[in-house]
């Protein structure tokens, strides 16, 4: 018995302004364990995800500070009222941006018995250095906010106080892990009823999280009320999504009148989402108001919110909600689609389609917010397609 072995390997080269150069390798292999019956396949590769223009060429950040505003002061003649502002412009730096990489490994098998063909693939993906707009230590800057007022001696400086200005910049802080299983079962055409059946489905679970730190500013707008900005760790914070979907497709031929009718039944057996949280209620440090310097607390110094309050940092506490830790899941629901194609000639074909043809919109009560309901399924829509082959 001959066992055929096939393999492919390659590498892709990409060069993009700002983010530079990257090589993306890929290897695939398959072997026929039982010729014309059973084969195994696998692969591993790294795909480069290039940043969009938003991340390559971000716009500058602009801040407008009102130094004096007399527009609504009726005690001053309208022609003498002053309105003066200072505009601060920060260049958004993305020189440290890297090319995101998606690592994917997969393994599966293909089984052929007569007209029936079954293909099953298990895979795992990991997106590293994904793009996201985030605040970092470098996006906070101290600005001296000068305010003026009118006195008997004219316009005088009334206060000169530091404020922290911030913006979001392109970062590589996003990470996504996906694992799943896909299958495709093609039963083939049953000649007695002129109908072909195909079943496919997938189970998928996705985890996404961000690196770096998050920041909480509990200050009011007035310059005199500005406070240091709290630093929070994002370690342990993650969001999850999971679903299991199958699709049954039946294609029926009516040769006498040139009709092809395709009915698709999609079943969403399981769909859920939830979040996990780390230490998102205790700050790990703060940014000083005077110079935006980073001041980290000794590790483990504060373990309770009361300890933070007793140390005089109560204003840094962020009222967080862990409502999303409750797993939101929905019982099975279904969607049916129809496609009818008429072959008028060898050159012309007309198709009518209707998605969610029964207008099924199941409602499920939210587990996080009892009493509120979520409407599921795609919206109903239909249309006509005309295909002309020349």
Name these PLM-found stretches.
Residues 4, 124-126, 143-278:
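Gram-negative outer-membrane beta-barrel transporters
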Residues 48-49, 127, 267-319, 330-333, ...:
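C-terminal beta-signal and adjacent terminal beta-strands/loops
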